[in-house]
């Protein structure tokens, strides 16, 4: 499953690997990878595979789920497809409450005591997913965990999720993606080394000259 999804993401250009010409994230950090899972929306076969995979993860790890919650905005569409497949209620959670109208942060019904699974497109440092989890908990929901399409497998993300006491499972990850990219001849040994060094310590730009 992990390599299959990784292959899909590479084929449609949802993930770019540029170890020799790094991207600059909004945080200012240099990165050899850029992930835009919104592109999956434009590829029916890919998004169907993702929805089926997320459903499988949820059934395996969170079988008692009652509500599917998407993170705004990237997780909304995937949450909708998954909830439809599972015939479950769905809501989505904003990064913060609206400044007008009812001032909702949670759109749709997620009632006190209900068991909820969060659907996220990407786990990097885990910030947006944790914001979603906290909002649902404040509303009295029991958050069973998070499922996502892809994770960078960053230690910072793992630590934040552990600190928030929330389980998280991804369809694919950085390790599987770099392995598939190497198998496809998209990266060579030198590039693979840089990619591996970056994941060990993203904040240390020494990987650029590795």
Curated annotation (Swiss-Prot):
The signal peptide annotation in the UniProt record is none
**Assigned keywords, A-Z:** Glycosyltransferase, Magnesium, Pyrimidine biosynthesis, Transferase
Q: Which GO terms describe its molecular function?
A: magnesium ion binding; orotate phosphoribosyltransferase activity
Q: List the disulfide bonds.
A: none
Amino-acid positions noted as binding orotate in the UniProt annotation, renumbered to this chain: 124
**GO biological process: what's one of them?**
pyrimidine nucleobase biosynthetic process
Is the Transferase keyword given for this protein? yes
Cofactors needed by this protein, per the record, are: Mg(2+)
Main EC class the enzyme belongs to: transferase
Q: What is its EC number?
A: 2.4.2.10
**Catalytic reaction equation(s):** orotidine 5'-phosphate + diphosphate = orotate + 5-phospho-alpha-D-ribose 1-diphosphate
Q: Which residues bind 5-phospho-alpha-D-ribose 1-diphosphate?
A: 94, 98, 100, 120-128
Under InterPro entries, the record lists: OPRT, Or_phspho_trans_dom, PRibTrfase_dom, PRTase-like
The entry describes its oligomerization and partners as: Homodimer.
Family as reported in the entry's similarity comment:
Belongs to the purine/pyrimidine phosphoribosyltransferase family. PyrE subfamily.
What's the stated role of this polypeptide?
Catalyzes the transfer of a ribosyl phosphate group from 5-phosphoribose 1-diphosphate to orotate, leading to the formation of orotidine monophosphate (OMP).
What is the name of this protein?
Orotate phosphoribosyltransferase
Species of provenance? Bacillus cereus (strain AH820)
Q: What is the lineage of its organism?
A: Bacteria, Bacillati, Bacillota, Bacilli, Bacillales
């Amino acid at each position: 499953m992990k390599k299959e999804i990784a292959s899909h993401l590479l084929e449609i250009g949802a993930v770019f690997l540029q170890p020799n010409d790094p991207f600059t994230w909004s945080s200012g950090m240099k990165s050899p990878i850029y992930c835009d899972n919104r592109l999956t929306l434009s590829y029916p076969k890919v998004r169907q595979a993702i929805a089926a995979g997320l459903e499988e993860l949820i059934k395996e790890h969170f079988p008692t789920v009652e509500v599917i919650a998407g993170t705004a905005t990237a997780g909304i569409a995937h949450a909708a497809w998954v909830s439809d497949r599972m015939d479950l209620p769905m809501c989505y959670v904003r990064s913060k409450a609206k400044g007008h109208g009812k001032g909702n942060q949670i759109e749709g019904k997620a009632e006190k005591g209900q068991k909820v699974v969060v659907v996220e497109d990407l786990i990097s440092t885990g910030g947006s997913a944790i914001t979603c989890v906290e909002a649902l908990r404040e509303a009295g929901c029991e958050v069973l965990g998070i499922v996502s399409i892809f994770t960078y497998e960053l230690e910072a993300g793992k630590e934040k999720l552990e600190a928030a006491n929330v389980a998280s499972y991804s369809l694919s990850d950085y390790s599987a993606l770099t392995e598939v990219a190497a198998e496809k001849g998209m990266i060579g040994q030198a590039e693979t080394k840089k990619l591996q060094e970056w994941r060990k310590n993203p904040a240390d730009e020494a990987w650029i000259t590795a």
